[in-house]
Swiss-Prot record:
Catalyzes the NAD(+)-dependent oxidation of L-threonine to 2-amino-3-ketobutyrate. To a lesser extent, also catalyzes the oxidation of L-serine. Pathway: Amino-acid degradation; L-threonine degradation via oxydo-reductase pathway; glycine from L-threonine: step 1/2. Binds 2 Zn(2+) ions per subunit. Zn(2+) can be replaced by Cu(2+), Co(2+), Ca(2+) or Mn(2+) to some extent. This is L-threonine 3-dehydrogenase. The gene is tdh.
Amino acid sequence: MAEKMQAIMKTKPAYGAELVEVDVPKPGPGEVLIKVLATSICGTDLHIYEWNEWAQSRIKPPQIMGHEVAGEVVEVGPGVEDLQVGDYISVETHIVCGKCYACKHNRYHVCQNTKIFGVDMDGVFAHYAIVPAKNAWKNPKDMPPEYAALQEPLGNAVDTVLAGPIAGRSTLITGAGPLGLLGIAVAKASGAYPVIVSEPSEFRRKLAKKVGADYVVNPFEEDPVKFVMDITDGAGVEVFLEFSGAPKALEQGLKAVTPGGRVSLLGLFPREVTIDFNNLIIFKALEVHGITGRHLWETWYTVSSLIQSGKLNLDPIITHKYKGFDKFEEAFELMRAGKTGKVVFFPHKG
């Protein structure tokens, strides 16, 4: 194994990132070193790349970016008993304390002291990466690395879609970015019908149809509320899944959901949002879920089973694959322009 490796690093508090050469790290107690087989870009990585207000408040350069990963264990640190060299793993990227009030009530996904790979510590946009053994998830040997790397964001989509009953229920999804596309795949695999997607990008509307959306609408050209009402004979949808983080999409979705329906919110809004709670939520008796992270480890079992079932239509979602990191800037700029689904790097070019 080489002593040096390439990594995409946030080297300074400014727009962009750099491809650097650094030492291959050594695992400490309770840690393993993985050879990164595949790693995908998340919206969080894009925020860090763009150096928005959230990134400025959270990230401390220099730091290796990235957290969605599939890899092979190549070295085991002291005290690790459940993993060995050669194990094929993905990683739960939220490192929880296990001691806070939430953790002691089995709500690990909302641990009050959560640390995140590639956010609070070095990440996985590299040839090799250190991960805590307790955060490893063993993958079936025949799972493609690009699928295995997507399990972490798929967990977000699964928790959003499956926060309540979905089979046979009319569903509106706002936002067909990478997470929204995963949400469409999960909703269709879980029996939702019809699945209606509101998305302004023509590129992503076409992707949504490929993944399985029954109807798509451009909210900049048509009123999505009227669109939904026409399809549902005026009833509105049973389920509203918000992936966009757009305040207007939230308002439209709340208007389009039927009284007594269910709402799951995953998209992060850029600012405080003003909503008519009385008329859009309280008087409609809506069931509203805020979604963050993944339930440990129930969601991982669900995600793995869905992938192995063959029912998830993931191939159209993975629109760009890169061997190595040489074109990482191109990948990020395409994502910024909304011209991708999921982007996956395969760090080892061979």
